[in-house]
Amino acid sequence: MKGYAALGIGKHGWIEKEKPVAGPMDAVLRPIAVAICSSDTHAMHGGAGELINVILGHETVAEVTEVGNMVQDFKLGDIVVVPCSTPNWEKIALQQRNSNNAHDEGLMASFKFLLSKDGVFAEFFSVNNADANLVLLPEGVSVDAAVMATDMMSTGFYGVEMADVQLGDTIVVFGIGPVGLMAVAGAKLRGAGRIIAIGTRPNCVALAKEYGATDIVSYKDGDLVEQILALEGGKVDCAVIAGGNAASMNQALQIVKNNGTVANINFYDASETFNIPTYDWGFGMSDITIRGGFCPGGALRMKKMLNLIKNGRIAPEKLLNYKFEGFDKIKDAFILMDEKPKDLIKPVVHIKW
């Protein structure tokens, strides 16, 4: 079969591989829509170590082509939504207290695509524990909306969940790329009173306002911390870091109240280091909670995301502002995401077989 792969650090292209075979609890699928994520390009450039001949991609809606003999809930021809994180549910690590199912066999190990197996930019790909990880595409939910639920929406919302946004809170969202935009939307759904979004690109700013941002702050207008403190007349209740660099953590700690929360959903390079001045963290006595996490996976999580879409609570498909047709266009969409033109939010590729 054909797939689009990382071929070493900074290298990518088409390769041929053997078609996967479904294990007893697994399914083999072929994508009908895929979205390109900055994590795909980041991985290709060696952000998590060198990948050689590893098929990329982790955001997809797909058709079931094979199921294992223990799979009960899916059959050939079903159109399903595939969460980006597909835990091995039998792993004992998922039974730990306060366990996030993203870490079934180690750090982020439930994120099988890219980390331990080929991804979805292929004619066929496999999903482990199909009954516990896949979800039938609900009637009334578009393929475009569903493919955005698999990662962008789930990840952005997880940031808001970690931040523990309460009714009437003021929240700051660092970065309004696709994940940050979903954090803005999630904060509105959770009842935030004021949502301050940090970003500069005009189309992202416009969409942030549509999703619920009440204020936009730009580094081009001066020091971010000073701007936010002036806007709020003091510190804010919580912050979600969905973009930026290690310095964003320092900025977040400077703007969040005592007893507040800083939630990080931004992936950092191994070369980056947090250097937190003790004053920013109240000499270690501020009771500010610092959390960072990878979005949960599995069918139940995805059903909840799709329920919000089906009932008109959110329209994540608005993130998709570049659309391609045909499997071979994955290459063009990948290059686009790697180059990141200023007007890009998110590309999708629709596939007909």
Regions found by a protein language model. Give the residues of each.
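C-terminal hydrophobic helical "lid"/dimerization subdomain
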Residues: 1, 222, 250-254, 298-353
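Mid-domain Rossmann-like dinucleotide-binding core that forms the NAD(H)/NADP(H) cofactor-binding site
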Residues: 79, 136-221, 226
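NAD(P)H dinucleotide-binding glycine-rich loop of Rossmann-like/cofactor-binding domains
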Residues: 88-174
